[in-house]
């Protein structure tokens, strides 16, 4: 059984612990105040890029939003055990979650990379809002087909294909056509 993580609640708690108001967080992260508010109230499922920007402003690693436990040493993620699942989207409401992230590093303290298995659900969308953030991403397709818009290029990846790119370039990852896909993604976001 997977456990739900309230990303918005963690962001609000961290922001308040730093005695920072929403307007300051919005300005420093270069995100609209309305978006910060919607994320904190769990009315908007954020994309990965806004989360990385918020994490940098709050002085925490991306993983801080994704799990509760912190451990020293090696962390083993077993297939049969529950994994942290977080739903992300690039859409305007929580009803349109198109990606379900399963953390493979839950509990690892001071990590520098974020490995995920991501279930990508079909959206029917044709126009995608590309985003960028500091860091690098590696994607390996486990099942299905995935389309990656990267800068002005579009790459179609099938099972067994991979792509590695600088995430400062505007990009978007989504399923191809109307089928689901599953990927292994490793995200590095400098702290």
Residue ranges of model-derived segments:
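Conserved short histidine dyad/triad with adjacent acidic residue
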Residues: 82-91, 97-107, 115-133, 167-170
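Ligand-binding loop in jelly-roll beta-barrel domains
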Residues: 97-99, 158-159, 167-191
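Short acidic-glycine-tyrosine-enriched beta hairpin
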Residues: 104, 151-166
């Amino acid at each position: 059984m997977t456990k739900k993580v309230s990303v918005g609640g963690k962001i609000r708690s961290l922001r308040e612990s730093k005695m920072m108001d929403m307007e300051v967080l919005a300005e420093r992260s270069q995100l609209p105040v309305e978006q910060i508010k919607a994320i904190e109230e769990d009315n908007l499922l954020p994309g990965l890029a806004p989360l990385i920007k918020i994490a940098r402003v709050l002085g925490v690693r991306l993983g801080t939003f994704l799990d509760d436990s912190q451990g020293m040493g090696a962390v083993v993620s077993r297939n049969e055990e529950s994994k942290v699942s977080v739903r992300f989207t690039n859409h305007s409401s929580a009803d349109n979650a198109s990606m379900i992230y399963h953390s493979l590093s839950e509990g690892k303290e001071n990590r520098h990379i974020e490995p995920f298995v991501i279930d990508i659900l079909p959206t029917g969308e044709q126009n995608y809002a590309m985003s960028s953030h500091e860091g690098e991403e590696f994607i390996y397709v486990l099942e299905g087909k995935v389309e990656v818009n990267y800068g002005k290029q579009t790459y179609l990846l099938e099972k067994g294909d991979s792509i590695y790119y600088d995430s400062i370039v505007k990009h978007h990852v989504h399923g191809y056509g109307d089928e689901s896909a599953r990927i292994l993604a490793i995200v590095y976001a400098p702290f």
